[in-house]
Amino acid sequence: MTQSLSGTAAGCDTCGFKLGEPIAKLEVSDLCFVSDHRFPGRCVVTLHQHATELFELSPSVRRAFADDVSRAARAVKLAVNSFKMNYEILGNAEPHVHCHLIPRQLDEPKPKVPAWLHPEAQAALAAGKAEEIKQRIVTLLGQASAA
């Protein structure tokens, strides 16, 4: 199931965690878009329920979260034609289960450097480009759930 959430304010009712603009409601999480010119298509998959660790989740929710991450990653990768998707599950700064999806491109200044060590400062994408990418991601998610 995928439901578009563009423009909707979402966040954890317990801790208030929210990162990015929610663009789709997945089975147990929201897909949020982060406008980042260094990594066009960057998103965060944020678990609906509050938890700080994957092992705190029931097996069914943990599997569903992994499926949400996988579905979202596929849509993002296809939307921006990246050669590799980086998955980051951290949590020391924001103690709420979430996974960063960072599409990597071969023509980046330093494609083999971890995203957090990128030499350029983050800046937003041009509004039109961001909207185009978000729409492609949501469309691809819809196609995946119809298959």
Give the location of each predicted region.
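HIT superfamily nucleotide-processing domains
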Residues: M1-A147
